Amino acid sequence: MSISNILNWFGKRGVEVYDYDSDYQIKNIGNIVIPEKLTSKNAFLLSNSVPEIFFPIDFYADRISKLIFIIENKSGREVASSELNRLISDEINPLFSFSDLVYNYVFSLLSDGNAINYLQVPSLYKTISPNTIERWDVLQPNLVEIGEHANINILNISSLKELIKKAQYLQGSGLRQDLQIDRLRIHNVGMKRRGNSVIFSEGLLWKANKSIDTLLAVYSARYNVYANNGAAGYLAHKATANTNSDLEAVIAGANKREQILKDINERNGITGRRNLWGVSGVPIEFVKTLATINELMPFEETLEDSIKIASVFQIPPVLVPRKDQSTYDNQENAERNVWENGLLSMAATVCQNLTKMFGITGNVKIGFDASNVSSLTQNESTNQDLIAKQLTNLEKMKQLNPEIDINQVITEIFNNYGKY
């Protein structure tokens, strides 16, 4: 029996595809389904199923959702008695708390690149305003189907509804609900659009798409090693005589060699649903294919990929979870830096978007209070200690330099240490 016949008998040719979509292929990995590569259609699902992708997005969504949201005036002071407080309370949705809605909003925005909001008003009202909005929902992005009008100059439109032809929401039971276009509010992150769409953005995860694709390949390879019990290589009878083997006759022709290589590569490997071992009809020794857990070094690879994905969100390596649960002395400073360089500005963006979405105008807006953030509070306490020490030295400074402007020095002290 020839090698080709043996291989054809041994298993099906090629990689077995379980589901196919025009945008990506899905392969069965154990009890879960993992797409081969990051796409615009699976970014949200990957963020909810792969820990290395989930971590940085949850890092932002969880911390921002736990902030204290307030209605404030232009000077930043809370307007406690405002009727607008209803919009940032648990009254705004019967299924989710306001904190849950903010979490869903940030998670969708950072994972999919888009937060799809739906506002509802009583049927007797025709316009959406802060006084008429009775419900706010953050729709799961992978369950929303939006048809866009083609050949429209986006520079000439005045509202989002001019771009949307039809919008539907798919519920878990298979029910399709038509959405009123004028109640949709879609917020994006990033300028780059998704494919031919002028509504949806590509999202931040695409800045690490190579690392994500590598990460998914590592998961696929690890599964195959475990599922196939670690066997890796070709098993054959070893030649005992110094004579020409059947292999020389088989590979004499270039076309035959190409056919053999193609046949082996399509069926054998450590990714997809391919075999980790094969059977040869010619006298060769066991050939190792390096498909062992130790040699794959999966934990080192996934950690490297995780660090690169987290860096997109300005999260330093010391905050990325590790298999040994190691901690670092500078983790506290690192988290404070993430707040100062990323989280605070993201929280401000969320407040600006919600203020505009609810139609809040005039001298008030939605803001947040970060006084419950321990890393920022500790930094503020440190700054207050520094201010106190600086102020106690003013008299000595005046004695050493009588011409010094005390008021100017005080102003400089508060400019340097008065804010976190």
Predicted regions and their residues:
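Structured, contiguous alpha/beta core segments that scaffold functional sites
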Residues: 2-295, 304, 308, 315, ...
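C-terminal amphipathic alpha-helical
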Residues: 61, 102-105, 249-272, 290-385, ...
